[in-house]
Amino acid sequence: MELVDLSVPVETGMPVYPGDPEVSVGPALTVARDGVNVLALHLGSQSGTHVDAPYHVDDRLPRLDELPLERFAGRATVVDARGLGPRAPIGPAAFAAVEGGIVLVATGWSRHWGSPAYEAHPYLTEEAAALLVERGVRTVGVDALSVDPTPAEDFPAHRVLCGAHAVIAENLANLGRLVEAQAAGLAVEVWLMPLRLTGADGAPVRAVARLG
């Protein structure tokens, strides 16, 4: 059995979606002064590797704590969408073999984490999102800043997926290892467990895959 960390590190100055709160992590208490070390965290609900609840794009849709835990864990299908150029659309053809469950889209864009190029990621088209919903997919993850283009005036892929009460995971990492494992015939299981934030639009996660 192999465990793969699919998360980016949470640290001061890390990349965030344009307009989101900047992240800072620093000491609130120290052993020298207070007898214990405690960190103070300042971050948004969409910081780092995180999940979006449907409420993220529509006030009428379920919030994070209203979703079943099954949305955040289970067997995953990994779609290899690597090799695309900046801001390339990922259409329905990429998901022709997908049937239900959790789908992770490996664009390879996590290699740009921390650089300006990270915002020029490939994205899901509205038609691709609609096909995933039609196929019964209720959790979609990407190794990019968003399932929609960045920046965006609208969020069509978000709206289609969230409208079906699907969960979206963004800023995943190391999906290439999952592509290799799946090609070798190994099962891929993932855990995308968010902080239990009441009434939230989303939350950071420690995303982990188990191969075997």
Model-derived regions: residue spans:
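Active-/binding-site microenvironments in catalytic and ligand-binding cores
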Residues: 1-212
